[in-house]
């Protein structure tokens, strides 16, 4: 395979842009990963990786997450470097800290890989459980701890304990009811609290996550409440404790203009708070830094029209400009960019377990006295074989669709046989295929027909995974993730396909796919070879998906492999999660596996079966209880 074909693969699946330098097509027709783009020669073929891990760990079954902690560290360095350049470029005198909100992915490998990257990093918690995890890791980071979310006294005491232990812990006031508890608990612990305030902005982004920002946001104080908070702290003699201003526009901000507008509005809060005597030293712009899941570099919900440098420049310039205009000190800037840190580092890889294809066979003419809709379908087919016919492709399609509808109606009323229905459906597929060949993608009038027929004629690939467990955002909010075969892409991509999971739910289907510089409802695929079914990669699933996944049909967490590649290309990895067993999932819903096994044993004994068959049934049942929840290939 030559470089031209590799470039075509890059373009077909738009890997160059969503891959971010971490993923690319290689000259074997497979997909490779580069955990550290600073060392571009150190790459790893994903197909070979899966085979090697399975050879050395025979119990590893697909689906499995393949995680690359070095990508996390590279993302951290890249974001920090972008803000360093922005501060130098604009003469910004304040510091900068990237804070990781662990809600994005609380896995130990994520937190500790980021902390051990050798870069400044803070941690953010939004619950008591998360705060306990953060405090336990606090001695490993020299930055700040930000405490967001709703708080009770236990949460507040935990945060103040961290401050008492010498950490820089900010309790961000989200509701006015919190400040009374904070002041009371601080007095009991004899500690000066370090406070922040989350201001609710009028500015709001657009897209799937816009509700997390703006005036209707779940969290934050309105302008009048901010003033009340200041009065409360002044009366308590604790106004100097209020040191951090926090706001949040929304997650995955697609448009840089929305970010710039929001930062400028928040900068006015900074100015006004200083006028009121509040010495704000930290400016937390929250989340919003998006990633380009589509690779379209656009304002689409699953894309972004900016890069790291432009984001950093807009944030630093807006804050610095407001400070300079009002002769105020430059505060330390904080961003909570969890998605941008984690999305790229994880790939879900699974196997295709079956394919439903539209097979085209020669059609025999119907009987002379065939029912009208069947005869009409055949007339359309014969017309299409005659060159120079004046009817349009669109007209042929519409006529055949109407005839097929009549066939189905007459079948329901008992007027047509099953054989006649099958014949009509087969002929309709042949008509669609014939029309599809004659359509011109450059003709705008043909484009809707092309899309319609691609969906109708596409192959159905059944993949061994649960959409609800592994890609919950694809189901819940129709988020797009890059999906493609990780092997066999040197073959002609002359088929269109949709991917379906193995749950008993009609929602278990991926609706949108990256296709070139756009998004389609089907994806390009090579012809399916049942002897060598391709493995499918679901990319950029490192943010939120692991923790949001649910247990629909009792499909559990997948296995996970942490992979490291040094500068010389030497590979090391560890199986960090073996994946949930059936017994694990049954216990989640309070079904005791031992009790179930005993009840099954009783049924088998009472069935008066041959003893050898009894033993076989019991062995299979027990083996299944402690086996993988996903489909397993027979040895």
UniProtKB/Swiss-Prot annotation:
Signal peptide: none annotated. Gene3D superfamilies: 1.10.287.3440, 1.20.58.930, Alanine racemase, Lyase, Ornithine Decarboxylase, Chain A, domain 1. It comes from Proteus mirabilis (strain HI4320). Keywords: Decarboxylase, Lyase, Magnesium, Metal-binding, Polyamine biosynthesis, Putrescine biosynthesis, Pyridoxal phosphate, Spermidine biosynthesis. GO terms for biological process: arginine catabolic process; putrescine biosynthetic process from arginine; spermidine biosynthetic process. It catalyses: L-arginine + H(+) = agmatine + CO2. GO terms for molecular function: arginine decarboxylase activity; metal ion binding. Pathway: Amine and polyamine biosynthesis; agmatine biosynthesis; agmatine from L-arginine: step 1/1. Belongs to the Orn/Lys/Arg decarboxylase class-II family. SpeA subfamily. Its EC number is 4.1.1.19. The modification N6-(pyridoxal phosphate)lysine is found at residue 103. Substrate binds at residues 283-293. Pfam families: Arg_decarb_HB, Arg_decarbox_C, Orn_Arg_deC_N. InterPro entries: Ala_racemase/Decarboxylase_C, Arg_decarb_HB, Arg_decarbox_C, Arg_decrbxlase, De-COase2_CS, De-COase2_N, De-COase2_pyr-phos_BS, Orn/DAP/Arg_de-COase. Its cofactor is Mg(2+); pyridoxal 5'-phosphate. Disulfide bonds: none annotated. This is Biosynthetic arginine decarboxylase. Catalyzes the biosynthesis of agmatine from arginine.
């Amino acid at each position: 395979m030559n470089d031209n074909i590799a470039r075509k693969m890059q373009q077909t699946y738009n890997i160059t842009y969503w891959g971010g330098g971490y993923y690319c097509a290689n000259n074997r027709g497979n997909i490779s990963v580069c955990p550290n783009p600073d060392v571009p020669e150190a790459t790893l073929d994903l197909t070979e990786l899966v085979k090697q891990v399975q050879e050395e760990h025979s119990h590893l079954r697909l689906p499995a997450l393949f995680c690359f902690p070095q990508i996390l560290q590279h993302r951290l360095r890249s974001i920090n470097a972008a803000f360093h350049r922005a501060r130098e470029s604009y003469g910004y005198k304040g510091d900068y800290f990237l804070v990781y909100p662990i809600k994005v992915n609380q896995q130990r490998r994520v937190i500790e890989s980021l902390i051990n990257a050798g870069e400044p990093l803070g941690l953010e918690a939004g619950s008591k459980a998360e705060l306990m995890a953060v405090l336990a890791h606090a001695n490993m980071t020299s930055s700040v701890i930000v405490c967001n979310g709703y708080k009770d006294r236990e949460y507040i005491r935990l945060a103040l304990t961290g401050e008492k232990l010498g950490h820089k812990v900010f309790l961000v006031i989200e509701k006015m009811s919190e400040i009374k508890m904070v002041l009371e608990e601080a007095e009991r612990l004899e500690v000066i609290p370090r406070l922040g305030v989350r201001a609710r902005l009028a500015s709001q982004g657009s897209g799937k996550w816009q509700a997390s920002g703006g005036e209707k946001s779940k969290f934050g104080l309105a302008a009048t409440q901010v003033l009340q908070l200041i009065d409360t702290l002044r009366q308590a003699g604790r106004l100097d404790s209020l040191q951090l201003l926090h706001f949040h526009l929304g997650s995955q901000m697609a448009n840089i203009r929305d970010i710039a507008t929001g930062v400028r509005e928040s900068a006015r809060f900074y100015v006004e708070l200083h006028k009121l005597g509040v010495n704000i030293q930290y400016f937390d712009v929250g989340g919003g830094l998006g990633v380009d899941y589509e690779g379209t570099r656009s304002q689409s919900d699953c894309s972004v029209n900016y890069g790291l440098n432009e984001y950093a420049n807009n944030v630093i310039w807006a804050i610095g400009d407001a400070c300079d205009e009002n002769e105020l000190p430059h505060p330390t800037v904080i961003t909570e960019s969890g998605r941008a840190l984690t999305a790229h580092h994880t790939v879900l890889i699974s196997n295709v377990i079956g394919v439903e294809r539209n097979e085209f066979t020669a059609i025999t003419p119907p009987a002379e006295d065939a029912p009208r809709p069947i005869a009409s379908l055949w007339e359309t087919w014969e017309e299409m074989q005659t060159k120079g016919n004046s009817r349009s492709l669109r007209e042929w399609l519409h006529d055949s669709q109407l005839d097929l509808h009549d066939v189905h109606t007459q079948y329901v009323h008992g007027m047509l046989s099953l054989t006649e229905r099958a014949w009509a459906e087969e002929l309709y597929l042949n008509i669609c295929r014939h029309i599809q060949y004659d359509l011109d993608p450059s003709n705008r009038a043909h484009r809707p027909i092309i899309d319609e027929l691609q969906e109708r004629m596409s192959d159905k690939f059944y993949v061994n995974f649960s959409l609800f467990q592994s890609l919950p955002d694809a189901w819940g909010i129709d988020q797009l993730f890059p999906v493609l075969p990780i092997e066999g892409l040197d073959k002609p991509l002359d088929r269109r396909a949709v991917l379906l999971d193995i749950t008993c739910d009609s929602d278990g289907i991926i609706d949108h796919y990256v296709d070139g510089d756009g998004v389609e409802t089907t994806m390009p695929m090579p012809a399916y070879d049942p002897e060598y079914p391709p493995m499918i990669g679901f990319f950029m699933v490192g943010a939120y998906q692991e923790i949001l996944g649910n247990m629909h049909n009792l499909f559990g967490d997948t296995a996970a492999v942490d992979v490291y590649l040094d500068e010389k290309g030497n590979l090391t990895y560890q199986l960090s999660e073996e994946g949930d067993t059936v017994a694990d999932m049954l216990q989640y819903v309070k079904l005791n596996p031992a009790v179930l096994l005993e009840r099954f044993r009783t049924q088998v004994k009472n069935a008066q079966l041959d003893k050898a068959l009894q033993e076989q049934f019991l062995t299979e049942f027990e083996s299944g209880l402690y086996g993988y929840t996903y489909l397993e290939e027979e040895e």
